[in-house]
Amino acid sequence: MSDDDQELGITESKSHNTGEWYAEVVQKAGLADYGPEGMSGFIVTRPRAYAVWERLQGFLDAKFKDTGVQNAYFPLFIPESYLEREKDIVEGFDPEVAWVTEAGNKELEERLAVRPTSESIITPYISQWVRSHRDLPLRVNQWCSVVRWEATETKPFFRTKEFLWQEGHTAHATHEGAWEETMTRLDQYASVYEDLLAMPVLKGQKPDHDKFPGAETTTTVEALMPDGKSVQAGTSHHLGQSFAEAFDITFSDEDEEERIAHTTSWGLSWRALGALIMTHSDEQGLVLPPGVAPEQVVVVPIWQEDTKDEVLEYAEGVADDLDDAGIRVELDDRDGRNPGFKFNEHELNGVPLRIEIGPHEVEDGELTLVHRPDGESVVEDREGVVATVQDHFDEVYAKLYATAEETLDGAVREADDRADILGTLGQHGGYVTAPWCGDEACEEPIKEPMAAEIVMVPFEDDDPLAEADHGETCAICDDDAERTAYFAKSY
């Protein structure tokens, strides 16, 4: 193996050393670098990772706009007095808030919070914009960064002090309208993972003790990582009337009676990139589904000097046809790099589909297509290359989804008591479902020894334990069970 091949290769094991493997993939695939010395918790997002984020952003933004959402932008800084108007926000985020206290050499009259979330700066403006029931529903979203000064170890795209996300905020005339909004956004988040990123997810709600500060209900999509930990992959909050009361969002109804609005907020961050990388990638490097890959297909011509001209001409024609069809294609016709090096490099970078073209393909009017996830090689006719490539994109997506779905299906296990929960989590990881009384105190006997928690409870319609007279008792305290709890370690 050459020095270049050694430099390209992934040396850590995904199954035995997941954290180090993940960090190596992120850096060697050119996705991110760590921030400057003295700024732990910050990363530099490199163009290839940002391109994936842009694809995700475009997919989700289109769904938002199709359902009545308009984009806006609000200040990065939030006056302390604004935060204090919603006490639950203050209590929930205060340990993580970064404050600006000086501008130039002058001390500010009021501290400014660097945006940890924007309810406190957006809601006052919604209050100004809403006067009548005719102004409702009102829906705004912003794509931005937020800062939360967490002390945990930096893990690119999973745990950083600054991260990219979108946050949507809406106001509605009724409780039912706000709940429908909450579920619409949750379904759209699930679609991002399942339809774009080829990742099955679980949908449910957070237990009351873990819901968003000030929320009536927090709904969540949870994704399972290969190390058996869960990722909170997106949340949608039914805020009830707490924020509307704090910030005076009122409207006159059809009878000219003054009413308090019902609000929601919902957000998805670049944690989705971390979950994507960790779920599909392998010990050859990054693996991406075609929908978000910066380069969807790479064409690699393979020639000897006496066949170079005809092979390159054939390969250029294939690449041009794909490019004209809107497929993101790269023609790798570099001199000085042998085909094996090119194959390894594009595998490391996660290109979903490779087309190999040598003298035999030219002579026979064919193409050799290789799938990134499993290395499957298929010979196809040159004619109709665009439709052929699109079909293979579908196959690559299906392979990725099927593998992830099989992993998730096999990682949900049942338990009836504390010892069983701890033993199953310790041996297998993943999700352990157990009957739960609804008391936060019954999470502690699992959290303390195992660092696991209740990451989700199913919605009432999906949970047999939400019905009366089921006869189940809590796995921890033996009181009557009210819900099914999903216990897991989490990022």
UniProtKB/Swiss-Prot annotation:
GO molecular function list: ATP binding; proline-tRNA ligase activity
Family: Belongs to the class-II aminoacyl-tRNA synthetase family. ProS type 3 subfamily.
Record Pfam families: HGTP_anticodon, ProRS-C_1, tRNA-synt_2b
Reaction(s) the record says it catalyses: tRNA(Pro) + L-proline + ATP = L-prolyl-tRNA(Pro) + AMP + diphosphate
Protein name (Swiss-Prot/TrEMBL): Proline--tRNA ligase
Enzyme class, UniProt record, top EC level: ligase
Domain notes: Consists of three domains: the N-terminal catalytic domain, the anticodon-binding domain and the C-terminal extension.
CDD domains linked: ProRS_anticodon_zinc, ProRS_core_arch_euk
Quaternary structure and partners: Homodimer.
Keyword Protein biosynthesis (UniProt): yes
GO aspect biological process, one term: prolyl-tRNA aminoacylation
Subcellular locations according to the entry: Cytoplasm
Cellular component terms per the entry's GO annotation: aminoacyl-tRNA synthetase multienzyme complex; cytoplasm
Main localization (coarse): cytoplasm
This enzyme's EC code(s): 6.1.1.15
Function: Catalyzes the attachment of proline to tRNA(Pro) in a two-step reaction: proline is first activated by ATP to form Pro-AMP and then transferred to the acceptor end of tRNA(Pro).
The entry's keywords: Aminoacyl-tRNA synthetase, ATP-binding, Cytoplasm, Ligase, Nucleotide-binding, Protein biosynthesis
